[in-house]
């Protein structure tokens, strides 16, 4: 079933810019094989370009009870198109030591700007790092529509790899490179 491995429905690429520890901007493009338009680009029929702006008004402090709080908005402007990610959200995350590892609990709420789009409602997740010196992450979350489970591993401090199930029906893999540009 090599055909099944390469006959995927979507693709995604993104660029994330974090000029300050409390501010982040992301541009993403999702490629879909749905036939909503006539022009076919890169073997896809539809592209959804979107951006995200996130601010963190409250940072988590080690040894204190309060979580990190982030508020954000996705795809705030769209002249036309799908706007799959359009909405705003608030999220809180708290990390706890668990033996030699660490666990992070996240809860939030996403409000879709356009009804019937990608996400709408409460979401949450858990991430477990069994050993702090080993860059392995085991994750599970609920994304307002279903449960996702995944693993991630960081190579050479910059290359992140991951594999996950999508609502326990399909699967995905990914690769990203993270670096800090010094000025």
For the regions a protein language model found, what residue spans apply to each?
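Outer-membrane beta-barrel transmembrane domain signature
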Residues: 3-7, 81, 85-157, 181-183
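Transmembrane beta-barrel domains of Gram-negative outer membranes and organellar outer membranes
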Residues: 1-80, 84, 95-98, 110, ...
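Flexible, glycine-rich linker and terminal segments associated
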Residues: 160, 166, 170-183
């Amino acid at each position: 079933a090599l055909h099944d491995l390469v006959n995927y429905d979507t693709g995604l690429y993104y660029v994330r810019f974090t000029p300050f520890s409390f501010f982040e901007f992301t541009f993403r493009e999702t490629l879909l094989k749905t036939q909503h338009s006539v022009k076919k680009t890169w073997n896809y029929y539809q592209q959804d370009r979107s951006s995200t702006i996130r601010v963190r008004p409250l940072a988590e402090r080690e040894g204190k009870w309060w979580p990190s709080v982030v508020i954000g908005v996705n795809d705030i402007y769209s002249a036309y198109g799908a706007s799959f990610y359009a909405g705003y959200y608030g999220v809180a995350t708290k990390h706890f030591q668990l033996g030699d590892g660490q666990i992070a609990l996240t809860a939030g709420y996403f409000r879709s700007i356009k009804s019937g789009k990608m996400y709408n409602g409460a979401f949450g997740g858990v991430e477990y790092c069994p050993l702090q010196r080993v860059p392995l992450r085991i994750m599970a979350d609920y994304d307002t529509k279903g449960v996702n489970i995944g693993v991630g591993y960081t190579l050479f401090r910059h290359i992140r790899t991951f594999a996950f199930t999508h609502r326990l029906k399909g699967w995905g893999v990914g690769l990203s490179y993270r670096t800090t540009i010094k000025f």
